[in-house]
Amino acid sequence: MNAALQILKDRGFFQQCTDVDGLSALMDKGPVTFYVGTDPTGPSLHVGHLVPQFALLHLRKAGHIGIDLIGAGTARIGDPSGKTEMRKMISYEEIDENVKKIEAQLDRFIGFDGKTAKTDNNKHWLADLNYIDFLRDIGSHFSVNRMLTFEAYKKRMETGLTFIEFNYQLLQSYDFLKLHERHNCCLQIGGDDQWGNIVAGVDLIRRKTSHEVFGLTFPLVTRSDGKKMGKTEKGALFLDKEMTPVFDFFQYWRNVADADVLKFFKLFTFLPVAECEEISAGDINAAKERLAWEITAVIHGKEEADKARDGAKAAFGGGGDKTSMPTAEISRSLISKGIGVIDLYAEVKLGGSKSDIRRLIEQGGAYYTDKNGTETVFSDVKTVVDEKFLDKDGELILRAGKKKFMRVVCK
């Protein structure tokens, strides 16, 4: 197997390939141009988008040429793959704004140089497409019977598949054809839920050009408990730090299950596999902290990763810099005259609604750090928090449950 493909396989990026021997032989001959697509249906990428992007960087490092295709055209429809219902339609203007934000995120992560890594946008060839001509030229090569055998469509047939979504596979296949024509792109990579779309694109190019191209998919990443990776209590784990604060991003990885550590090291860091295995075989808490730091450094930079790590240490009583913790400011007068503990938690937006906070306190899950640095439980929902609750720095460190912290600064 070609060395680049072996790297993907060793790190857990390999699920299916249309012709692994043919692709391996092509890669042995020299650089292969490949692409991964991302639809800008939201203002930020989330962790679910990261696997193809890490694969892109591994292939690029091995000498191949990557294209990040931003799907401003396909985002107008929405991909039915992996969805139980039709994606909510958003305006063209909102899609264009999302494109700008996502391109900037990808550029920080990938570093587009226009040679070894570049972007394209399928809006260029889809926005003004003549539908009749498209049906004659492209649609005539597709079998409805075969399309309905693919998992993405079979699942949606149970809940209702709209005609507009049914067109998505044709459009994604057309993307592959256009990238083959524009950039000599010979490989599409993506999650395994894209297998049907990728195979259809490979087949379309063969029919239209007689050229052989390839498709490769990655396993859909789930946690060891079977849940979707990157999902939190607040929803998706976004790369935009305004949507998911860096501290929360760090803490997500710091708190992954023991069984997931090695897998996530291989997928979401660039450390050699042997080093990933060595770290994961050692102290598991140290391994999780290293995992969290490595991923946060890749996405947000080393300085932000250091701050998040220091904030986590301070939150959990292991030293560190508490100014790096999530912080809320409240009026000094509220503390001076006293504020009910439920109202305090609500004021700093920790613990959910007031009824949630009441239950949290009644179940013994609300804490503060006293002047001696000792964490103390709020045992009474009627507790009034005043200046005697402040720590030696005149601040409050609050905790809700096992993992949510807030540094409260009185102004």
Regions found by a protein language model. Give the residues of each.
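Positively charged, low-complexity intrinsically disordered leader regions
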Residues: M1-F34
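Short acidic, glycine/serine/threonine-rich loops at helix termini
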Residues: G78-G82, L129-L135, K227-E233
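A charged helix-plus-loop insertion that forms the helical arch/lid used to bind
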Residues: P80-D96
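Conserved nucleotide- and phosphate/pyrophosphate-binding catalytic cores
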Residues: L204-K411
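Flexible loop/turn segments at secondary-structure boundaries
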Residues: P43, A75-I77, A127-D128, G196, ...
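Divalent-metal (Mg2+/Mn2+/Ca2+)-assisted nucleotide/phosphate chemistry catalytic cores
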Residues: R11, S91-Y92, N98-V99, E103, ...
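Short, hydrophobic/aliphatic alpha-helical segments
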Residues: K29-G37, G66, S173-R182, T222-R223, ...
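N-terminal catalytic cores of NTP/NDP-binding nucleotidyl/phosphoryl-transfer enzymes
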Residues: G22-P80, Q188-W195
